[in-house]
């Protein structure tokens, strides 16, 4: 080896170390985000955040970071997490900030679920697209959809009675709630269910959704580092990619079938078709298909997650369960008297249970990420430069003493005027997000939550299988949404005097 080659070989590590040292110095001393509190390692590298992302512990880590550093924390070199109750939601979600390109690569290309630039004409298209879909989720539309929702809730109750009458074995309520909510949303969208409750099995495309969730963590990391994106094809299962293509084709076929089928009953598609091209606003067929795919997930999995969490919390808090049983049994002398209107207006404790379950175990635990537009913005009192990724972590915000007293205690009474919780910052509680991109399906979600929990409590005595599911909540992991283990519950028909 000649002298020149030896010098070049020895210099290479030094160059690498020099570049690394320069980057560290820049990130800590010169970077526009250097004034944001947070761990120094997180300011320099994505690795600490990625480690928790892969482990499914991002929300627990967010709670810890906000406890240590405050309401605004730099969690990655170009990402900031906020939990400020009064300012974070309106500052980030109350205006049409740009949806981050990081998640834009994961989402479908839809006029409603994706906007490239929050301050140009495409933002207007986004708002217009929501107007078309909003008719399907109105209070009036929900009343017309009640018979369909009731039918599947009744099927849930009937099938549980059939299965549990034969033996005293526990059943996995995570699975049963998913079957119910996916059947409801499929019938509302396509005019026919997945058939999960009928067959007591998970439809192949429902299973595909849960398989896909496991890939989101790695896709997120790869999207953060453009020079690593070529690894995506090596990491993501090619069979899974093919199944996703098959699912998209299946959704399009189902939409076509529903469009070509006349039906007197109101459902999502009837409202979309009736209001499309209203006042010159029209979704293309591709956008209808894309939003049907989105609504299949958003209108089912998150509701089932809340129901699973609420059931676990009720069964591990006997006093709360007894109070809820007393309310349901006294308000509804018969099973048939449980209607959407009745559970909304006559069951304050049930509604408090749902609100507290949404706070304690939010179905979407992480924040919807946004990118600060050109020129930068002031957010929660901090100047944030353009291009920075922002989000409000729901789980961290709801489990912070800065926003809620006794944040790690499950107390439905906090929503019923208990004076101990009068100083809770309700503005920090936004389980369906906030502003022009807030969840359109909140009315349907609340309706399903109330109706299913009320009829489950009215119909059954439930008991958690302590051996299998005692630590269920602790074993849940976050893959953007919750990955939930089996929730084994013994369900026995209630004896009505």
UniProtKB/Swiss-Prot annotation:
Primary site of residence: membrane
Gene Ontology biological process terms in this record: biosynthetic process
Record key words, sorted: Heme, Iron, Membrane, Metal-binding, Monooxygenase, Oxidoreductase, Transmembrane, Transmembrane helix
GO MF term set: heme binding; iron ion binding; monooxygenase activity; oxidoreductase activity, acting on paired donors, with incorporation or reduction of molecular oxygen
Names of the cofactor(s): heme
CDD domains for the chain: CYP60B-like (cd11058)
Membrane topology recorded in Swiss-Prot or TrEMBL: Single-pass membrane protein
Protein name per its UniProtKB record: Cytochrome P450 monooxygenase caaC
Native species: Aspergillus niger (strain ATCC MYA-4892 / CBS 513.88 / FGSC A1513)
